[in-house]
Structures are given as structure tokens and as C-alpha cells.
């Protein structure tokens, strides 16, 4: 809990610091851009834990000399996904802003056991199909230096099949469609020189996520996330970014933690299989599944580590528990730093920079506070960033305790929300 209190203390300092202390930090450009641009581009996306997919995307920036953007994409391969979003729709210019989006998917993520000590070779492969919509309303002040938002994610999903690590499919599981909803309330204090590409200053974001849970076999809980990032310039052409992240789950209504009762409710039906190796494997997987549910009902599940945002060498969602903590450093060297208009038929806009990045991250998850710092996982690597007017193309190559990863994604790391983790 000390880490959470530290973040809250830093927030109080920020809120109580006189405005004059930040007089030397001014926005480098208008935070509500008007530079029209569009991009039609092939996509070869690699997301740790999901695999590789190919497709195409299109983005239109600052439509009709406004701040509104449109983006859409479609991917097929190891996973299928498509999405469409309208961003920065101003109901009240520069004050009340809305974002809306729709996404559908068919994925088979690698799902590991709970905890920081979970075995990398012990996992299941649930194939999931679903779709969801997102609506967010934001009130903004002082060139987007302070914002508060409410966000709703609503959709549905269902299991198509479940396989073990050897590809053996389980015959008995729930294939019915389940509705999903997550309501989020959050705020951002962004005292930096630029929202998209900060070079100096500090940014703090806090959010509370409220999953709507109607299943009587699941505990009700909510999640609080805290994300603090500082940007320290050394010269005109480089910046050191420092990030501290913490997430807690808070159980408000505890469901059953009795093994026998949960076996009746969520068991895999292994008793229907004939005695033999397949049944033994099913029983072992069922035991893991039920023990996972017991821990989830007792502690809840905070935001996970691994994937595109934190501990980038690990699969998405690799580590999860009732609490999560991580910190990271990223040194960004600006190879070019000028506004360069371009128009190549399938793309038009303004390139504002190309960066080389070097990063290192450490993080852990835990159910008991006594275990907070007992086992930390490490990830480090190098990357390339292409900064455009309104979006950043990011390429990362990283290594860690469980191997290496290559990632192509959009925008800087350490975000609270991303395309692969919108809730």
C-alpha cells in the first residue's frame, strides 16, 4: 500500500503546487491540431500473446478543418480484428469532447495461470469471438493540461473452443454469449510541453474501472489504476521518460471460494470422459481453473502486465493478480525534429520527428502486500518511433526473462488504454 500512498502524495503535491512553478512549461504547438492528413497503410501487426496478423488501415486527421479524426482497420491471421473510431468530436469547442468506437474480434490468446511465479509452459488457449462499442466523454481545460472523463465499454463475447498447450480441445465448456460492460471514471493532469510527443514535464493519470458483474459465481470488484510519467530533457534532441504504474482490485462482494461448490458451477465436466490420460489432463486443467477462480473471488483482478504497454517482451496479459506494480525508463533520441509535409497519394500529412528509443522495465503482480517486491520481472530493448501529426508509429524489439518479442504498434508505451486493451 505504500506505493499507492506515494502516488496519492505526488498527486496532492501536483494539485497544491503554484501555477508559477510550471511557467517554464508551455505547449510547443496547438493541442487541437488543424493540419489535415490521411494515411492508407498496410498493417503487419505482432501482438505478444496473440500472434501475427496482416491487413490494412486508414486514418483521416482533422476532418473539415476541425480536430475530429477517423480511423479504421481490418486484420486477419493468427487472430482476426477490425475496428472503427471517431475521435475528438467537440460538442463544446475545446471543452467537451466525445470519442466513439466499435471493434470486433476472434482471438485465441495465450492465457497463463495467476501470479508472478506462474509457469510460462503452463497455459490454455481459449478461442474467443466478440464485439464491443466504446463511448467516452471528456471535459478539457488549459490546453488539455487537465481533463476528466467518463467511459463506457459495452459488448458481448463467447467461447468457440478451449485447448490445452498441446492443442487438445476440451469438449465441455460454456459456449453461450455473455454480455460485458465496464464503466470508467478518470482524470489526467498533463503539465508537459506536448500531449502527443512530450519532451519535458510530468503527467499523472488515475482511473477507476467498474466491471458490471451479474454472475453469482464471480465476486464484484472494481479496479483503480495510477500512472505517473515524468519527461526529463538533456539536450534539445533527447528526452528521458520515467514511468511508475500501480493497479489495485477492490472486492466489494465476495462470491464463493469453496472448491466443491465451484466445481459444480464452473467445472469442465471431466467426469464425462472415460478413465485415462485425457481425463487426467482434464482434471488437472480443471483444478487450475477452479483455483484461479477462488483467488479471483478472494482478491479480484487488477490490470495485467505484459504486452504492448508494460513488460513488452512478455505476452499480453502474461501476469495478473489482485495488485500490479511496474516502473520503467525510456531514453528517446530525436534523429530528426522538423515539420516535414508529405503527399504520396496514399498518405498526406506532416511528419514531425523520427526517434530512436532504448528502454528498460521491471514489474510484478501479487495478491498479498507482503509479496509486493519478492519477484520482479525485467524487460529491455530498443525501438523506433515515427511521429506524425496526430499519431505515432512504434516499433519495439525487446528481451526479458522469458525470451524476446518484436512489436509494431501505435502511440507511445505506458498508456492506460490501448487498442488491444480498451477497457
Question: Language-model segments: which ranges?
Answer:
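Outer-membrane beta-barrel initiation region
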Residues: 21-101, 149, 174-199, 302-312, ...
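Short loop/turn motifs that connect adjacent beta-strands in outer-membrane beta-barrel proteins
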Residues: 22-36, 63-69, 91-97, 141-147, ...
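Transmembrane beta-strand segments of outer-membrane beta-barrel domains in Gram-negative
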Residues: 26, 110-253
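Transmembrane beta-barrel strands of outer-membrane/channel proteins
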Residues: 44-46, 56-58, 72-76, 84, ...
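Residue-level signature of outer-membrane beta-barrel architecture
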Residues: 46, 60-62, 88-91, 137-143, ...
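Outer-membrane beta-barrel translocator/channel fold
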Residues: 77-142, 149, 168-169, 241-304, ...
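C-terminal outer-membrane beta-barrel translocator/porin domains of Gram-negative envelope proteins
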Residues: 185, 196-349
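Outer-membrane beta-barrel "beta-signal"
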Residues: 185, 384-388, 404-423
